């Protein structure tokens, strides 16, 4: 479930002749700052071919041109190729920029329209930013499918085709949250050693890492994971690395702790973070069976439990088989066992399908 990035090819030709034969629109820039602004503005409009009459210094010009794209992750994520041609005389230079985007301007407009329609459907007036962010995350995970063939790269693809690599997941998360005025960033790096991209989201005063791609279980069985939902930097970097030279906000507040402070019991249960509560931590097989029996009474779509590392795989399977005897359950699946954020316990994430959808999915706030 990792992203395959498209390499940005930059061809810089410094040619010593006066005029540049070009077909795109022309803009003026007299210094590096103005040059960057022109490039960013035109790329933000998905302009595929434009010219710049540049009268500033040529010192480090190749680095300036390359870094303009590299340091703007949103632009870089929407581009497949960039070609720069530069010709110069003693006092003026002409730069032609040709760009191949992963979508067209028309597709961007269509995607934005679709995003507004979706948000109108999934966002309620009473929701706070925590609930809005979760609604966006859940929509993307439930309606998206990771593109194993690596043919689709954009949020437009994820919206219209229902599939994309991580670039599309991260872009759709970015664009949906941005329209809700929730601060959000794109973060580039690696996931288990492969090029990857995800998001950071600011909720109230705190920034968190959010990887909607890795929260979409594979194979796609119509379930939602929250294993990479609102993590600290320490938590995300267990299997992600962050590219250098990015403006990364500090992220040290554990989302579980913050939801406890806010008394958001409903969100704790819905995201499975209530597994950190004492009553949802299994010290032995008997505890595990007891917790599962209690939780299944509320017909959840997902059950998350912390359990002692001494509990064997056969004990886990035995406990899960006892759930399967309930005749209203059609399917039980679980994600790979991982350690919790303390490293001292393991986590069991169960995904449950019912033969009939309950009229109302209730949540377990009960205490033993």
Language-model segments: residues:
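Residue-level detector of well-ordered alpha-helical segments, enriched
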Residues: 91-94, 132, 136, 169
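Secondary-structure boundary elements
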Residues: 103-158
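N-terminal accessory/pre-domain segments preceding catalytic cores
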Residues: 20-127, 237-368
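Catalytic cysteine-centered active-site loop
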Residues: 147-153, 163, 184-194
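Periplasmic OmpA-like peptidoglycan-binding domain that tethers envelope proteins to the cell wall
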Residues: 158-167
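Hydrophobic/aromatic-rich core segments of domains that either
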Residues: 168-236
């Amino acid at each position: 479930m990792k992203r395959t990035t498209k390499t940005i090819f930059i061809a810089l030709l410094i040619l010593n002749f006066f005029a540049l034969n070009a077909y795109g629109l022309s803009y003026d820039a007299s210094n590096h700052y103005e040059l960057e602004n022109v490039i960013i503005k035109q790329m933000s409009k998905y302009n595929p071919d434009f010219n710049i009459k540049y009268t500033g210094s040529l010192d480090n010009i190749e680095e300036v041109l390359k870094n303009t794209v590299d340091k703007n992750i949103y632009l870089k994520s929407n581009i497949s190729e960039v070609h720069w041609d530069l010709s110069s005389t003693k006092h003026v230079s002409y730069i032609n920029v040709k760009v191949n985007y992963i979508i067209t301007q028309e597709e961007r407009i269509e995607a934005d329209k679709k995003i507004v329609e979706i948000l109108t459907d999934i966002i309620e007036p009473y929701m706070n930013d925590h609930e809005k962010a979760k609604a966006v995350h859940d929509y993307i995970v439930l309606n998206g499918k990771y593109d194993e063939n690596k043919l689709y790269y954009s949020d437009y693809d994820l919206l219209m085709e229902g599939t994309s690599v991580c670039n599309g997941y991260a872009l759709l998360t970015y664009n949906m949250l941005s329209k809700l005025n929730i601060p959000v960033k794109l973060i580039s790096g690696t996931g288990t050693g492969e090029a990857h991209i995800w998001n950071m989201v600011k909720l109230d005063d705190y920034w968190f890492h959010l990887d909607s791609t890795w929260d979409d279980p594979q194979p796609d069985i119509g379930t939602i994971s929250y294993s990479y939902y609102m993590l600290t930097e320490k938590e995300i970097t267990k299997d992600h690395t962050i590219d250098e030279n990015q403006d990364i906000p500090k992220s040290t507040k554990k989302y579980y702790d913050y939801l406890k402070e806010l008394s958001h019991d409903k969100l704790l249960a819905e995201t499975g973070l209530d597994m950190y509560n004492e009553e949802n931590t299994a010290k032995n097989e008997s505890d595990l069976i007891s917790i599962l029996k209690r939780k299944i009474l509320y017909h959840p779509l997902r059950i998350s439990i912390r359990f002692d590392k001494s509990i064997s795989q056969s004990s886990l399977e035995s406990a899960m088989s006892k759930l399967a005897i309930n005749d209203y359950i059609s399917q039980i699946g679980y994600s790979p066992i991982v350690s919790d954020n303390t490293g001292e316990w393991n986590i069991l994430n169960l995904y449950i399908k019912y033969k009939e959808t309950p009229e109302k999915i209730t949540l377990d706030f009960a205490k033993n």
